[in-house]
């Protein structure tokens, strides 16, 4: 299952921090974290979740969920909402609203508008609400500028600040390439999880390293940052974590 990795990342609580950013290094796949968080949120009674599919379509998350022991179809349309950008574009082609400039709105403007509409429709009736954005990098591929992506994330962070029980979780792949954007987005939140390659290269028992950074508020003028490193291995039906050095791997 996914309990150990969520516990290591501090994402196993019913109430999550307002903004969490996942930085995915090149040649590393951090999609498992989105699937793990999704499953955890769906299991909480009356917790709402909105999944925004940019990198993978909804069916991918359904399949991943079944391997991790949960069925997204049971929750869809109830506590789970989905904005499946990828499937919309595949089904509608160039007619998709995500590929057209509607009334002068950019892609990111339209996406924020749809997310806000879903939140306003469902937030009040839920004990908590989580918005999952599976890969900001895809917005660059669809023509969004770095400034538009940054503004998109700022709008999402503002949405979270307006609502005490709302959490926004974003992921950015190739974070070492989009380093400036990645750092700017990470500064919007309280938790940053970096998914990194092993310095020693490929190892059969470990897929990579998680560096978890958390900012703890201490009044108006001071804060404390905690850092933790763990190794992880994604198996077919679970994700395991290890302490560095536990299995003799140099990181």
UniProtKB/Swiss-Prot annotation:
GO cellular component, one term: nucleus
GO molecular function: insulin receptor binding
Organism whose genome encodes this protein: Drosophila melanogaster (Fruit fly)
Database matches in InterPro entries: ELP6, P-loop_NTPase
Main localization (coarse): cytoplasm
Origin: domain of life: Eukaryota
GO biological process: establishment of mitotic spindle asymmetry; melanotic encapsulation of foreign target; oocyte microtubule cytoskeleton polarization; positive regulation of insulin receptor signaling pathway; tRNA wobble uridine modification
Pathway as given in its UniProt record: tRNA modification; 5-methoxycarbonylmethyl-2-thiouridine-tRNA biosynthesis
Family: Belongs to the ELP6 family.
Biological function: Component of the elongator complex, which is required for multiple tRNA modifications, including mcm5U (5-methoxycarbonylmethyl uridine), mcm5s2U (5-methoxycarbonylmethyl-2-thiouridine), and ncm5U (5-carbamoylmethyl uridine). The elongator complex catalyzes formation of carboxymethyluridine in the wobble base at position 34 in tRNAs. Binding by the elongator complex stabilizes microtubules and promotes their growth.
Phylogenetic lineage: Eukaryota, Metazoa, Ecdysozoa, Arthropoda, Hexapoda
Disulfide pattern: none
Name this protein carries in UniProt: Elongator complex protein 6
CDD domains: Elp6
Subunit text: Component of the elongator complex composed of Elp1, Elp2, Elp3, Elp4, Elp5 and Elp6. The elongator complex associates with and stabilizes microtubules; efficient interaction requires the full complex. Interacts with InR/Insulin-like receptor; the interaction may stabilize Elp6.
Phenotype of gene-disrupted mutants: Larval lethal with developmental delay; larvae spend twice as long in third instar stage and die before pupating. Larvae display abnormal tissue morphology with reduced size brain, ring gland, salivary glands and imaginal discs. Larval neuroblasts have abnormally shaped nuclei. Formation of melanotic masses in the hemolymph of third instar larvae, increasing in size and number over time.
Other remarks in the entry: Named 'poly' for the abnormal shape of larval neuroblast nuclei that resemble the nuclei of mammalian polymorphonuclear leukocytes.
Keywords attached to this entry: Cytoplasm, Cytoskeleton, Microtubule, Nucleus
Cellular compartments annotated: Cytoplasm; Nucleus; Cytoplasm, Cytoskeleton, Spindle
